[in-house]
Amino acid sequence: MSSIVVVGTQWGDEGKGKITDFLAEQSDVIARFSGGNNAGHTIQFGGETYKLHLVPSGIFYKDKLAVIGNGVVVDPVALLKELDGLNERGIPTSNLRISNRAQVILPYHLAQDEYEERLRGDNKIGTTKKGIGPAYVDKVQRIGIRMADLLEKETFERLLKSNIEYKQAYFKGMFNETCPSFDDIFEEYYAAGQRLKEFVTDTSKILDDAFVADEKVLFEGAQGVMLDIDHGTYPFVTSSNPIAGNVTVGTGVGPTFVSKVIGVCKAYTSRVGDGPFPTELFDEDGHHIREVGREYGTTTGRPRRVGWFDSVVLRHSRRVSGITDLSINSIDVLTGLDTVKICTAYELDGKEITEYPANLDQLKRCKPIFEELPGWTEDVTNVRTLEELPENARKYLERISELCNVQISIFSVGPDREQTNLLKELW
């Protein structure tokens, strides 16, 4: 048995989907373990581009299982729209499996997300307003509705009526707004559940069977470590745990099942939404990176904030996620810059620190300490080995590996599959 966890080491959008797809060819099962349809990833398959939000990357391989684990929050209507879109383009989806313990996102979660963000005013978090946070809140409050409940008509009716009564009082008191009614929700979402019924099962058992059969399992992360509810830039984070350790909770397998953890990063840094970003760029270099790298959110379409590579962030991610191997994407985006920079430490109140602060106010006062390296002008998009890279590009990657104390096992010089290069066998 072998398994690999793929996690983002920054604030999401690192290219995890492409790396997951790249590794999926040799795996038997691909499983998601956190997040919801707030996570967007772009996949190149069969010469076409696909943008997925809930469906695991493994859906494109009909001989492999694509699993949505119990740690994922599922909007049934959004999921069906995604599945229908794939079917219309000739992609079969019969290999999908959904955990019967996954929480369901309902219309009142989307409304609550909108109202709460509005109430925050200038302190808004930058939520995608997909209902993710409120769904996880209901899970912890033990009033959440799970996929297993959605499939049973009487159970769903009883729980939905109870929740709407609670939400109506909450919405009125907190926002002076009304909650979507029972009639607005019940028939549409029960019907959606019935359409998804064939996919719903105990996915923990599927994964356990795969391990017993000595199959290869790939765990697909969403967002990034710096958006982790515990280890990220709190409170500007997501509502779940994208770190590798959440594989055990989010899919129902034991920690001994994990063999390797691949941390995916860009050769620079990007972020969507609000929150601290010590190496953020506002100059021509930032404009170059955003436009050449097409830095616009898959889910929101919002322009991403961009900045220099931050080794303080990556060291933090390596430690809290147990990263064994590094995949560096988008090296080609930096081509043409005279100088490239790596943040090696921060200056906080006149002192140099090398670890990421937990306190938000301290983080806002941090100034990046940069190491400058010469850039390169040579086209790298057809490079297939480290040795073929321009010397300056190769030294840049080697310095990142050295600063972060993790080996580079994959590097990518463009968006296409053939531009993703494996430096060592991972399975």
Swiss-Prot record:
Q: Where does substrate bind?
A: 298-304
EC class of the enzyme, as a word? ligase
Gene Ontology terms for molecular function: adenylosuccinate synthase activity; GTP binding; magnesium ion binding
- The source's superkingdom equals Bacteria
Question: Could you tell me which Pfam families the record lists for this protein?
Answer: Adenylsucc_synt
Binding residues for IMP, per the UniProt record?
Answer: 13-16, 38-41, 128, 142, 223, 238, 302
State the InterPro entries in the record: Adenylosuccin_syn_GTP-bd, Adenylosuccin_syn_Lys_AS, Adenylosuccinate_synth_dom1, Adenylosuccinate_synth_dom2, Adenylosuccinate_synth_dom3, Adenylosuccinate_synthetase, P-loop_NTPase
Q: Which reaction does it catalyse?
A: IMP + L-aspartate + GTP = N(6)-(1,2-dicarboxyethyl)-AMP + GDP + phosphate + 2 H(+)
> Where does the chain bind Mg(2+)?
13, 40
Identify which cofactors the protein needs according to its UniProt entry: Mg(2+)
Where, per UniProt, does this protein localize? Cytoplasm
Recorded GO cellular component terms are:
cytoplasm
- What keywords sit in the KW lines? Cytoplasm, GTP-binding, Ligase, Magnesium, Metal-binding, Nucleotide-binding, Purine biosynthesis
In this protein, the active site sits at 13 (proton acceptor), 41 (proton donor)
UniProt-annotated binding residues for GTP: 12-18, 40-42, 304, 330-332, 412-414
Q: What are the GO BP annotations of this UniProt entry?
A: 'de novo' AMP biosynthetic process; IMP metabolic process
Q: How is the cofactor bound?
A: Binds 1 Mg(2+) ion per subunit.
**To which pathway does this protein belong?**
Purine metabolism; AMP biosynthesis via de novo pathway; AMP from IMP: step 1/2
Q: What is its EC number?
A: 6.3.4.4
Q: How does it assemble?
A: Homodimer.
Which family does the record assign?
A: Belongs to the adenylosuccinate synthetase family.
User: Per its database record, what is this protein's job?
Assistant: Plays an important role in the de novo pathway of purine nucleotide biosynthesis. Catalyzes the first committed step in the biosynthesis of AMP from IMP.
**Protein name, per record:** Adenylosuccinate synthetase
Organism of derivation: Staphylococcus aureus (strain COL)
Gene label: purA
